Structures are given as structure tokens and as C-alpha cells.
């Protein structure tokens, strides 16, 4: 404020944020030019791979409060900024950290969107960490936290992030947030990251997450590389690498991850057992992901599928090579006839405590009797639908005569 007036910020009560910093006045062209130049500097001079913009809700809404209305000047600025960045550096990745329900954050600007490539899924991050911090006995009541993210996931192009924000300022590191003893934390950490990589959406992790770091991040010192002298942390780093390679080499885990047709729940009501299972589909491949979040093992747990298949294990988070306790040897599994919920086939799997398993499914020809039973059920469903349609037509005709 060289002459006593505001230079970059507003001159009213919206001039400062809740953190005491100034809010830029996006209605002044010189301010927008300054911010555009700052973003371009990171891309052109420092050759960054992309830009992540923090707390954009404070720009989208006045003081970050939807009740105060949309800041149209900020919306226009963000659209122009993203359009310019994508035009000059089309391979860059431009991300928004936003905890609001503002629409079209990741829609292209030509469709009146804000133009970001991805939006951080803050809800997924909070719900996941809250769930894994919950004592085992209380997890049935929190079961829905793991399911909830898929209710809104396809509204935007979401990115799953466990970033620097989650390992500073007394929040504890990822592994230290988890409930239980040291051994239980270690097992659950493998399952938490299994869930992250098997969940639709791009992934982002902060340095040190791959080590199972117990000390919070400190910008004044390097990571605790000595942790790799300990068996769990050394094994976890290797596990993290294998998990990342699985994500990169199994098309079903990334192809179509923003297409709702490529995801299907298999088990989402096993609250007492703490079991979740889902299918990922893409590029002609189907992968079954099964997660046990309780500290008790489940033998011969039934999973119901709509097609007969063989199952080849890709990953077991409780394998001894990762420090796990499941010493069983991988073997090919096959569905059996019979099921529930309109699914005609059952795959039975053993689930270690706090462990997860991933299978590649190969469709098999249905047995004649199973195919006939399925055809009979389909025919019965068609007859029921026809009766319902006829009844509605009769009711409409009757009402029209009244």
C-alpha cells in the first residue's frame, strides 16, 4: 500500500482471507496479468510438470462462502489462466484443490468450465483417513465412508491425493494416523494404498509416503532414509513400487477410470465383516479388488458375480514378502454356480486380517444348467416387466375415461 490504497487486493471486508493473507482483486487487469505471469514463470523458467492451485474456493466464492455468492471476476480469471496454460504448455497438468461443490471445475473452458485437468478429491482423502483411524469395533458404523466417494466421483475428473498437507502441523504421517499397534498399522497401510490404487482416479503421493514415514515432514531436513534398515519399511517401499507398476501395467486400473460403466460394486454391504469388493473394467480386462478392513480373517468369503470366471491373483497385501502373515500359496480360483441379488455365480476367497487381494478375471463359458437357469430368470423378468407395463397402460386408459 504505497499510497495508502490497496494495490493487489480489494478495499472492503473481502480484502483478507481467514489466514490473514490478502485476496487478489481479479477485476483489475494488471493484477490478473501479474498472476498469469507468475504461473508462466513456473512452467517456462523452472520447467514444472504442472501447477496445483490451493484453496480455489476462496476465489470462486467471496471469502470462500457460497452464501455470499460467486466471485465472477475470479471465475473469469481462472478460465483465462487455464486456457492460456493449456495453449502454451498442453502437456502440463493443472490441478485444483477445492472442497466445494462448484460445478464444472474440470470441464473444458469451451464448455463454460473452469478448465482444470483434475480436482483433488478432498472428500475421499478425509473419509479414507477417518475410517482407517477408527477403532476396529467402531468401523461397522463408519462403513459408509469408504463407499461414499463413488456416489459423486463421476461429477468431476477427480485425483486422489495424500499430499504434504496431510503430514504436517501435528496431523501425524499417514501410517501414524492409522488405528492399532505397530504391526496393525503396517498391515493397514498396505491395504490403504491398495484401496487408493484400486480406486478410480489418478494418484498423487507426497515424498516419504512410500517409506512408511513416522516423522512429520520438515522442510529443513531430508527424509529418514535409515528407516529402510527396518524390515517393514524396506518391504513397504518395494510393495509401493509393485503397486505402482500394477497400476501402470493393468489397463483395467486406468482405462476408463472416469467412465461409470467401468466400475461395479461386488460387496458394499458387509459392514460387520468390514469387507469391500469391486470390479474395475477397461480395455477388455476385468479386475476384482477385495479389501478386508477388520482385524479378523474371513475364510471362504463369498463374492457374487454376474458371469462365470477364473481368477488369477495379482496381489496379496499380506504376502510374507511384504511383511504379511498370509503364508498360503496363490492358486487359480473359479466361480461356482449359484448366487444372490440376481448374480448367478459365486467366487469364494480367503481374506487375511487387514489384508486385500487383487484378481484378474477371465470369463468362462457358463455350464448348460446355469445358462438355462439364467435364461429362465431373464424371461421371468421380461414377463414381469411386460405385465407391469400392461397394467400401467390399463390404468392410464381407465383414468382417461373417467
Language-model features, listed with the residues they occupy:
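Trp/Gly-enriched beta-strand surface patches
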Residues: 309-341
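Core domains of carbohydrate- and sulfate-ester-processing enzymes
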Residues: 1-17, 21, 134-150, 323-324
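Short, low-complexity intrinsically disordered segments enriched in A/P/G/S/L with frequent Arg
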Residues: 395-396
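C-terminal beta-strand-rich structural cap/linker in extracellular carbohydrate-active enzymes
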Residues: 330-371
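Aromatic/hydrophobic pocket-lining residues that form the small-molecule binding cavity
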Residues: 32-35, 39, 74, 78, ...
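Conserved alpha/beta catalytic core and glycan-binding cleft of carbohydrate-active enzymes
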Residues: 47-49, 61-220, 248-303, 307-317, ...
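Catalytic cores of secreted or luminal carbohydrate-active enzymes
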Residues: 232-253
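Substrate-binding/active-site clefts of carbohydrate-active enzymes
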Residues: 1-70, 333, 382
